[in-house]
Amino acid sequence: MRDPFFYRWHSYIDDIFQEHKERLRPYTEAQLNFNGITVTGVQVAPERGPTNTFQTSWQQSDVDLSRGMDFVAPRGNVTARFTHLNHTPFTYSIQVNNSSGAQRMGMVRIFLAPKTDERGNEMLFRDQRLMMIEMDKFVVSMRPGQNTIRRRSTESTVTIPFERTFRSLEESRPDQTTDAQQQFNFCGCGWPHHM
């Protein structure tokens, strides 16, 4: 659990960064353009349900809190049940045209932002910008012509599965020399998949 001060400090640093960004010259079109590469379509397909629609639901989960708390007398595990938002896994399909005539490498970054404000009014991009959250970030190779990039939500580099969010550090520890050990030692940073 994070100290409440963390969030205040994080907000303060964000504000300083935004003040700095407002003093910079706007990016030029040349800086923002990727010559020869055009995104021609984007689609989000859930495992079930209509295309371009997130299927969300409430779910209850149990978590062991005893690793993050000190007790005067040993009491065993302390578990808590909490209700959280979850979603059906989905797949991004991005259609890209590479008219450069050569194979190109690119970085795909996917963000989620609100489309409308609390009154239902469509938001301007400059207002959405501060509310965006990165959903995924990955490198792709694009051959000349039309390309379809597919990526499952569970493959995201910025999210972690629920099991690694609240895992036990004592149980199932693999041998020191295996690839599984590197995976086990993963820092656990990232947004939970279920968010």
UniProtKB/Swiss-Prot annotation:
Reactions it catalyzes: 2 L-dopa + O2 = 2 L-dopaquinone + 2 H2O; L-tyrosine + O2 = L-dopaquinone + H2O
Matching entries from Pfam families are given as: Hemocyanin_C (PF03723)
One record GO biological process: melanin biosynthetic process
Q: What main location does UniProt list?
A: secreted
The note describing how and how many cofactors are bound reads: Binds 2 copper ions per subunit.
- Cellular compartments annotated: Secreted
The text of the family note is: Belongs to the tyrosinase family.
Q: What is this protein called?
A: Phenoloxidase subunit 1
Q: What is the lineage of its organism?
A: Eukaryota, Metazoa, Ecdysozoa, Arthropoda, Hexapoda
